[in-house]
């Protein structure tokens, strides 16, 4: 998959891992996962035009449980999971904010 754009890769991974595909993917931000400690980078991508096409769950050696949570309930669902003792990646919160806001803080319309 070395020739793929970030957008194409994001849509492919979305489908493999969740069973959903997207008509469009927009790169919102690319940055380091751990500044100064690694050269690894993460891309935050906003997918739109979603539709269910399969079961998801990953491929081969991946063991992914898919949770389908409506966007409007995502923050409450994540908060409930934390109160149940789950440790969640902080990037989830950044991603939720970025899909609803431009980087300068303006709401997406």
Predicted region positions:
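Extended aliphatic helical segments
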Residues: 6-8, 27-30, 45, 53, ...
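Active-site segment of metal-dependent pyrophosphate-handling enzymes
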Residues: 15, 19-53, 80-82
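Conserved Nudix-box catalytic region and its N-terminal flanking loop in Nudix hydrolases
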Residues: 1-12, 16, 50, 58-60, ...
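Nudix hydrolase/Nudix homology domain
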Residues: 2, 35-38, 43, 60-109
